Curated annotation (Swiss-Prot):
Its main location: virion. This is Protein OPG096. The lineage of its organism: Viruses, Varidnaviria, Bamfordvirae, Nucleocytoviricota, Pokkesviricetes. Keywords: Early protein, Host cytoplasm, Host endoplasmic reticulum, Host membrane, Membrane, Transmembrane, Transmembrane helix, Virion. It comes from Vaccinia virus (strain Copenhagen) (VACV). The chain crosses the membrane at residues 39-59, 67-87. Belongs to the orthopoxvirus OPG096 family. Induction: Expressed in the early phase of the viral replicative cycle.
Amino acid sequence: MEVIADRLDDIVKQNIADEKFVDFVIHGLEHQCPAILRPLIRLFIDILLFVIVIYIFTVRLVSRNYQMLLALVALVITLTIFYYFIL
């Protein structure tokens, strides 16, 4: 149990370090642009990070649960056929 707690502490420390690095990069990009464009740069970077996180989550979800997703798709197709052709 102690090994898991130590590993979680390491993950938290790494996440904090990664967040500081990303903030440093964003801060550097913001100061290279005119003041008028800074909010747009922040918005673009936030949207880009959001899309990356969604992509990683989707790839992980599909790769770990593809059997269940295929069964769900088959069920939806079957129910759609039943709804349109039988009812």
